[in-house]
Regions:
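Low-complexity, Ser/Thr/Pro/Gly-enriched N-terminal "stalk/linker" regions
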Residues: 1-53, 61, 69-73
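Serine/threonine-rich low-complexity intrinsically disordered regions
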Residues: 2, 11, 58-62, 112-113, ...
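Structural recognition of alpha-solenoid helical scaffolds
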Residues: 6, 10, 14, 43-46, ...
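Helix-turn/linker elements and helix-coil junctions of extended alpha-helical scaffolds
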Residues: 51, 55-58, 110, 194
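Post-signal peptide N-terminal segment of secreted/secretory-pathway proteins
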Residues: 54-90
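Eukaryote-skewed repeat-based solenoidal scaffolds used as protein-protein interaction platforms
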Residues: 76-194
């Protein structure tokens, strides 16, 4: 088996497994208090992002594209309740960027929630939103998401990229786990996950 076929088979298997276990993405309201309500949105956002890239790059076969569309539809309609869970999350933590970051790939795939978008636009105008303390790569990601949404980034990407590990270009032999994660995400944010 060649490497391309192996990678394809792993991807197909992963997508089929996710589809078969899609009910596992539900958001229980009586979650363990040690796990934040908004933190549980992240896997749903990752799912939407992965499916968006699959569609954009045209790398999924017709069966995989159908499964991916069904996964996204399920996540939007059942897990996020048509965006209402994101609105609830934004109301619970108005300064959290998580509902916005989860929403954007769904919006780019054609889903919308006017109520969520109103909340995101309102919060975007707050000075507290721009003043949130976060790592440079996290700030770069948020600025990229704001640009993709059509909002002027509160902190321009060009002003942030130089503060990232990759932007500072230190000694490459010092890369370790967290740094490698930050490097890959710097590239992801600058290339829209390309």
């Amino acid at each position: 088996m060649n490497h391309t076929r192996l990678v394809h088979n792993v991807g197909v298997g992963a997508l089929e497994w996710l589809h078969a276990h899609r009910d596992g993405f539900r958001l229980e309201l009586d979650v363990d208090p040690e796990i934040g309500f908004l933190e549980r949105f992240k896997p749903v956002g990752e799912l939407a992002l992965i499916c968006k890239v699959l569609f954009r790059e045209g790398v999924a076969g017709s069966r995989q594209a159908t499964l991916a569309r069904q996964l996204i539809e399920h996540a939007w309609c059942h897990t996020l309740d048509g965006g209402r869970m994101l609105v609830r999350g934004q109301r619970a933590e108005p300064l959290s960027p998580i509902p916005f970051e989860v929403y954007l790939p769904f919006r780019e795939l054609g889903y919308s929630s006017p109520e969520a978008e109103r909340a995101f636009r309102l919060n975007h105008r707050l000075d507290s939103y721009a003043a949130l303390e976060m790592s440079p790569v996290r700030r770069l990601g948020l600025s990229a998401f704001q640009r993709r949404f059509g909002l002027p980034p509160r902190v321009p990407e060009a002003d942030v990229v130089g503060a990232t590990w990759l932007g500072r270009a230190p000694e490459p032999w010092t890369v370790e786990g967290h740094i490698a994660y930050d490097i890959t995400h710097t590239v992801f944010h600058l290339t829209d996950w390309g």
